[in-house]
Design a protein with these regions (language model features):
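GST-like fold's C-terminal all-alpha helical module
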Residues: 101-199
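GST-like domain detector, emphasizing the conserved glutathione-binding G-site
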Residues: 1-128, 132
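Short beta-strand edge/turn micro-motifs at domain boundaries
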Residues: 20, 200-201
């Protein structure tokens, strides 16, 4: 297998790298430099017609894209430690939280990135007022998440899971582009310190 991705702070390839470290797996990796538009080159589009990373090339020559889908595939091959849950309830809870983080927090951070950051100015027509309007949305979500984390150690409960990987990469990407955790969200800050202290956090 070979993993095609990009260096930090790109959040989606990093999800898979963290997952691999948590699983104790080693996979050949190849960088796809996004700033050079390598992900839009015809050779890469043969691997993923959407021109996005990460992409996992399987031993049979086929390709998987989308970070969560790649990690689900790897979990199927290497079930332990279970990062998608070991019971139907745990699996559903982790899925719920993955969806919540992606839809409620990653979405506004992505809008801020695409519509306000200088690095994306040449890639699309930026609507800066729209981008800035998403800061209030992100702030509300951070405060909601802070309340949820008041009673549990990790995003989906008392065990570290794929939901924590999604949240960590999302929040740290937000920090890198100027969307910090609000100062009064102490539970989110404490949670991030816990996951950032894991060996996988350097991936």
């Amino acid at each position: 297998m070979k993993l095609y991705g990009e260096d930090n702070p790109a959040p989606n390839p990093r999800r898979v790298r963290i997952f691999l470290v948590e699983k104790g797996l080693t996979v050949e990796q190849e960088r796809v430099p996004l700033r050079e538009r390598a992900h839009k080159a015809s050779q890469f589009l043969e691997k993923n017609s959407l021109g996005q990373v990460p992409v996992l090339e399987l031993d049979d020559g086929s390709f998987l894209s989308e970070s969560v889908s790649i990690c689900r595939y790897l979990e199927g091959l290497h079930p332990e430690p279970r990062l998608f849950g070991s019971t139907p309830k745990a699996q559903a809870t982790i899925d719920m939280w993955i969806r919540r983080i992606e839809l409620q927090l990653m979405a506004p951070i992505a809008h801020i990135w695409r519509h306000t950051h200088p690095l994306t100015a040449g890639l699309l027509t930026q609507y800066k007022d729209f981008g800035e309007s998403n800061r209030a949305h992100a702030d509300r979500v951070f405060h909601w998440l802070d309340t949820e984390l008041a009673g549990q150690a990790f995003i989906a409960g008392e065990a570290y899971s794929m939901a924590d990987i999604i949240a960590q990469t999302t929040i740290e990407f937000g920090q890198a582009i100027g969307v910090p955790i609000p100062e009064d969200c102490g539970h989110v800050t404490a949670w991030l310190a816990r996951v950032a202290g894991r060996p996988s956090a350097t991936a």
